[in-house]
């Protein structure tokens, strides 16, 4: 399972060159264009279009953080303790910045991720199922962490 996720990331590398930065901003452009109902989580950026997002310095950085998180999760999937610890480390900054996501979004992210990934390469059923399984493990840990913190879960 982890191998399929890691292999699929070859087309969406992190980095500092124009192409790799675009990998991250293109995810957020897709999110803003196809899921405008989620824009309210991006305070101060709610009215941006996908085209605006691609030019935003904020989303250039945020896109790299998101890509890096997906890379790290895929590489840690066969190390359950580290995978769970990293999932918790993703939740904590959201709480510190008062970005209280609806609990269902921790799992609903993954179909959006797959939609984006399919713009970069052909995503076969094995890869799709691998990402959805990873996403379920991730979401389960995020929700457990939120529960332990007394947050909505």
From Swiss-Prot:
CDD domains: Mb-like (cd01040)
Residues binding heme b, per UniProt: 94
The protein, known as: Myoglobin
PTM characteristics: The N-terminus is blocked.
GO CC, alphabetical: cytoplasm
UniProt KW Metal-binding keyword: yes
Molecular function terms, GO-annotated: heme binding; iron ion binding; oxygen binding; oxygen carrier activity
Domain Globin residue range list: 1-147
Pfam families documented for this protein: Globin
Family: Belongs to the globin family.
Signal peptide (UniProt feature, chain positions): none
SUPFAM superfamilies: Globin-like
Role: High oxygen affinity. Probably supplies oxygen needed for muscle activity.
